[in-house]
Amino acid sequence: MNTDFTNLTTENLSNEHLCCIIRSKKSHPGIEAKRQWLSDRLNEGHVFRKLNAKATVFIEYAPLETAWVPVIGDNYYYLYCLWVLGSPRGNGYGKALIEYCIADAKEKGRSGICMLGAKKQKSWLSDQSFAKKFGFEVVDTTDNGYELLALSFDGTVPQFAPNAKNLKIESEELTIYYDMQ
């Protein structure tokens, strides 16, 4: 197994391949939009760690306090994505990446790590059965089948924001979440 991983930084971001988006040989505006979005997020503690190879092998996570998700909690990391695609799958890369995230969270004194899952696996979500092998547990659910999984180091747990949990907006105001991720 190749163990040569790279964490994206503001210094190397412009030169590194973003293995998670648009698989096109031509330039695509989504690639530069993602680079700009990442550039802003890296300064907030966002982590994008990838295999140094032409492959889709990466993990992406951020402090929950700055994550663009309707989840409430203190001192957690939010795992946006863990993806190992194609021939690298089954070679220990996912394990290495999630273990890196867990070690990073513990080293930084985080309360734990959380991620989105679903009762019925969706193709765009990280595989929650894989995460459960590392101790992640369902700590909250929504009315429409989404699940919040967490690996707690201190007994605290995050939860879905009330409007995400019930898919209901109590006021006349509307909040739209949008990002370049």
Please annotate each region the language model reported.
Residues 127-131:
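Conserved active-site tyrosine of GNAT-family acetyltransferases
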Residues 116-117, 135-149:
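Conserved catalytic-core motifs of GNAT/GCN5-like acyltransferases
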Residues 84, 90-105:
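Conserved acetyl-CoA-binding loop-helix of GNAT-fold acetyltransferases
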Residues 1-52, 170-180:
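Short amphipathic alpha-helix that is part of the acyltransferase structural core
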Residues 105-120:
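Conserved GNAT acetyl-CoA-binding A-motif
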Residues 66-79, 89:
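A conserved beta-turn-beta hairpin within the catalytic core of GNAT-like acetyltransferases
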Residues 54-66, 78, 83:
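Conserved beta-strand in the GNAT
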Residues 143-170:
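C-terminal "cap" of GNAT-fold acetyltransferases
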